[in-house]
């Protein structure tokens, strides 16, 4: 059985849990609150920190940071119901398949969440949207773990 809890990240949800089950916000509410520009600013802030990060920075190809930023922004806009561009250009997200070549353990998950949390704080993502995004990001980051001991 896979352990999905981590004391540091209180928002790791049990398997099948949904962010909206712990808050009143949903995808449409996040988009109303943040808008596409807000989501893109948040993602840009995240990627400003990636190259200098000693743990997850090496997972990203420096030459493709712009592409990675665009893919994450498009994925989030798709997942939040604002756009189908991601689906039209990339197909099904297949997140585990797309990340399987990277060793992602607890440390990597937590660092990714730290950088995303910093990006949300830096760009002023409103508390109401954070109520949805915090557990959403924690759930996705934990889902991508492929190293039990890390």
Task: Give short role names for the model-derived ranges.
Residues 9-150:
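Core of compact, soluble alpha-helical bundle domains
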Residues 1-10:
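Extreme N-terminal basic, low-complexity initiation segments
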């Amino acid at each position: 059985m896979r352990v999905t809890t981590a004391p540091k990240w209180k928002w790791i949800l049990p398997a099948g849990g949904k962010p909206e089950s712990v808050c009143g916000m949903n995808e449409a509410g996040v988009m109303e609150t943040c808008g596409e520009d807000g989501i893109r600013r948040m993602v840009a802030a995240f990627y400003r920190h990636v190259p200098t990060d000693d743990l997850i920075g090496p997972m990203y190809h420096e030459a493709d940071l712009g592409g990675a930023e665009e893919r994450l922004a498009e994925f989030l806009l798709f997942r939040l119901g604002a756009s189908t561009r991601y689906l039209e250009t990339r197909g099904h997200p297949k997140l585990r398949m797309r990340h399987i070549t990277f060793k992602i353990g607890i440390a990597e998950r937590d660092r990714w969440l730290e950088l995303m949390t910093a990006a949300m704080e830096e760009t002023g993502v409103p508390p109401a949207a954070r109520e949805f995004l915090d557990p959403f990001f924690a759930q996705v980051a934990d889902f991508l773990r492929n190293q039990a001991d890390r």
